[in-house]
Amino acid sequence: MLAKRIIPCLDIHNGQVIKGMQFRNHKVIGDIVPMAQRYAKEGADELVFYDITASSEGRVVDKSWIARVAEVIDIPFCVAGGIKSVAQAGEVISFGADKISINSPALNDPYLISRLADRFGVQCIVASIDTWYDIQLDRYQVNQYTGDENRTKVTNWQTLDWVQEVQKLGAGEIVLNMMNQDGVCRGYDLQQLRLVRQTCHVPLIASGGAGTMQHFQEALINAEVDGVLAASVFHKNIINILELKKFLAREGVEIRLC
């Protein structure tokens, strides 16, 4: 059995790490490189960096900080932010990123996923999906341009359909960003994760809602995800990564201990 992954998420804006709640009201948390170093030392298995306004602003993620991060950490990291071509992805990888995450650009150009997978291999291509549960319609909808609350829009894709589509196109991993739970710290949406798990045959990463160590355990065991991504509990020092891993190991989760 492959070890489960603990993945801190760093949302980037104007060269700094920020964090909001339900993808809104973002506040500055700290500087990129020191935070990346801290999480690597604490025992993170991987890091994810989202330049959250790159797509909505029509630009590509700033690559200068990518090189600085690559110099100071020795764990894999994934980068997202306005990547719309093989050439742009190649530049990000050349600066040190191990994986490319595609979100809004893939909704405009789904075959971008295929072109990237053909060039770099499916193991390098992550489909990041921002999913919102619409209570009135009683369904999960994919959202786009979520880094800017004034430009966020609901797409025509229902989440489960898009999960199936990105796999067909060549995504080697899926990160499910559950917007209703984001920053609330009340637990992952286990019902949605179970539904997605049934149709997801590549590694599935849960994102949005972690507030306690038990929340990580529930997602890993009850929803059978391959990894758990979180931000607030790590940024605010509510949970230490090494202590979290020790707890999960005691609970029977296959996990890498440093």
Swiss-Prot record:
UniProt keyword annotation of Cytoplasm present: yes
SUPFAM superfamilies: Ribulose-phoshate binding barrel (SSF51366)
Keywords on record: Amino-acid biosynthesis, Cytoplasm, Histidine biosynthesis, Lyase
Gene Ontology terms, MF aspect: imidazoleglycerol-phosphate synthase activity; lyase activity
Secretion signal span: none
Gene3D superfamilies: Aldolase class I (3.20.20.70)
Broadest EC class assigned to this enzyme: lyase
Top-level lineage group: Bacteria
Keyword Amino-acid biosynthesis: yes
Quaternary assembly: Heterodimer of HisH and HisF.
Its biological purpose: IGPS catalyzes the conversion of PRFAR and glutamine to IGP, AICAR and glutamate. The HisF subunit catalyzes the cyclization activity that produces IGP and AICAR from PRFAR using the ammonia provided by the HisH subunit.
Family to which this protein belongs: Belongs to the HisA/HisF family.
Protein name: Imidazole glycerol phosphate synthase subunit HisF
Protein species of origin: Baumannia cicadellinicola subsp. Homalodisca coagulata
Gene name in the database record: hisF
